[in-house]
Amino acid sequence: MGVPSPVRRVCVTVGALVALACMVLAGCTVSPPPAPQSTDTPRSTPPPPRRPTQIIMGIDWIGPGFNPHLLSDLSPVNAAISALVLPSAFRPIPDPNTPTGSRWEMDPTLLVSADVTNNHPFTVTYKIRPEAQWTDNAPIAADDFWYLWQQMVTQPGVVDPAGYHLITSVQSLEGGKQAVVTFAQPYPAWRELFTDILPAHIVKDIPGGFASGLARALPVTGGQFRVENIDPQRDEILIARNDRYWGPPSKPGIILFRRAGAPAALADSVRNGDTQVAQVHGGSAAFAQLSAIPDVRTARIVTPRVMQFTLRANVPKLADTQVRKAILGLLDVDLLAAVGAGTDNTVTLDQAQIRSPSDPGYVPTAPPAMSSAAALGLLEASGFQVDTNTSVSPAPSVPDSTTTSVSTGPPEVIRGRISKDGEQLTLVIGVAANDPTSVAVANTAADQLRDVGIAATVLALDPVTLYHDALNDNRVDAIVGWRQAGGNLATLLASRYGCPALQATTVPAANAPTTAPSAPIGPTPSAAPDTATPPPTAPRRPSDPGALVKAPSNLTGICDRSIQSNIDAALNGTKNINDVITAVEPRLWNMSTVLPILQDTTIVAAGPSVQNVSLSGAVPVGIVGDAGQWVKTGQ
């Protein structure tokens, strides 16, 4: 090996020093920051929307329809839904010190004020809140008041319209936000008018209109809740909080009314917490099942409807009071009431002509029940031949109609025959086809009459046909159906028994001058002891082709002029209603036109998961009057 030269040794040494210096410098140099990384800007994720509080209420079925002003639509569910989704000028508050158990207070969410502003003529001015609107954003206005008045006066089969019959005009002021209502006379019960106001701009244009357009729908509403869906097949009604409501919002977001099913199924549903509130028909066993569930509150309450059997005394065969009395005497009211109630151990019999069992001053005034022998004796005294031989005869025929549904059935075994001049006494009982309870009661009544020899049939009709064409054409001799309970007694008396309620008088048209109607004109009073007077044979036709005609509301077809002054005095407040009832009640029984049967009664229950449910509300609205305040716990 050679020895390295000096030059090479120097180069190696210098290189080593340079390398060492670089390493030292590298160790002292600050490291550069890492390259920036691409990252997403953090965002706050909003929480999911809170599910609306849903309360489920068990019911029997959704009912025949949703117009609260029609006799054929009266039902507990309709009363409840209407109170929750429709605006009212005044609302009922429980008060046992009043004749009907309710006092009526102004609804401040709809009205700014409602006052009597003139006594000559009697005038009430309603000031509507500017923000009050329907769910389609249309304003709630005086036009809606005008429309309801016109319909209540001109449509047949409405609920006790005597108060509306006194109105002579409804004026719209302040851009529709003020309704000035003028009456023909003072009317102390004016606060009970304009409840459950309907959206005129919708109802007048939907198919069927006021009379049948709301049979399965409430497309536009104006209350704390709106109708989300109606499912007749499943018997369900879904109502939801009305987001356009201008007043305090409801606490429940959703209330689902649904069919409860059999008593055992309802008890299981309440026990498991699937159903929180219930209002159903049922007997003592169903009530006991619900009452036995821990922390479940139960009660029995009456609903705002009573069932009656009404004879049409203007029909020639029923013109004789004794014949009517005999027919009503042949009916077993206890059995009819059991059929109407759906049970035989929880029946609330109605045994008065004017007051209902729910009225604080109610006492039974019905005369003692008549025996069948006594009833048949009255028929014999009226010229009928009573044959008690058992025979088989075909079911009696009824007038032909394309709109009828007749329960004729197979030939009946008749234990007798009641006839006059060789013709058997017939009786066609009309009933609304959409009301299965009334149909069942009517069929039972027909069975009882056929059993003694009266050829009775049931004619189930569309409600519009029943209360208009069938009455005008005398196609029915009697009617079985519901009447309202819990309303003003003087109005009830005038609507159902008054002589003016038989007349077809004119109503001012939309643009016609509003003048007070003339006194009703009727035939000369009869000399018969009961002073019963039939209506004119034909309605008077209006001279103005644009005028409307009042629809008679007295379904009996006659009136007693000897008590008309008392009826008028009760209506205008110059006589105490209690004194008037004492005076006229015996006369109404003597007329033998109306047989009260029962007041509808239901079981109500509230589970522990819902607070603020009152089981004793005002009769017209039931337990849902405060549903906007129901609170579901645990949410």
Curated annotation (Swiss-Prot):
Q: Does the keyword Phosphoprotein apply?
A: no
Keywords tagged on the record: Lipid biosynthesis, Lipid metabolism, Phospholipid biosynthesis, Phospholipid metabolism, Signal, Virulence
Query: Could you tell me where the Low complexity compositional bias lies?
Result: 390-411, 511-531
The protein's matches in Pfam families, at most eight in alphabetical order, are given as:
SBP_bac_5
User: According to the UniProt entry, where is the signal peptide?
Assistant: 1-26
Kindly tell me the pathway this chain contributes to.
Phospholipid metabolism; phosphatidylinositol metabolism
Which GO biological process categories is it annotated with?
A: glycolipid biosynthetic process; peptide transport; phosphatidylinositol metabolic process; phospholipid biosynthetic process
Q: Write out the GO MF terms.
A: peptide transmembrane transporter activity
* CDD domains named in the record: PBP2_Lpqw (cd08501)
Give the matching InterPro entries: SBP_5 (IPR039424), SBP_5_dom (IPR000914)
Q: What does the entry list under GO cellular component?
A: extracellular region; membrane
Q: Does the keyword Signal apply?
A: yes
Instruction: Write out the ranges of the annotated region (Disordered).
Output: 32-52, 389-412, 511-551
Q: Which family does it belong to?
A: Belongs to the bacterial solute-binding protein 5 family.
What role is this protein assigned? Answer: May directly or indirectly regulate the accessibility of the key branch point intermediate, monoacyl phosphatidylinositol tetramannoside (AcPIM4), to the elongating alpha-1,6 mannosyltransferases which could regulate the lipoarabinomannans (LAMs) biosynthesis.
This chain's protein is named Probable monoacyl phosphatidylinositol tetramannoside-binding protein LpqW
Source organism: Mycobacterium tuberculosis (strain ATCC 25618 / H37Rv)
- Show the taxonomic lineage: Bacteria, Bacillati, Actinomycetota, Actinomycetes, Mycobacteriales
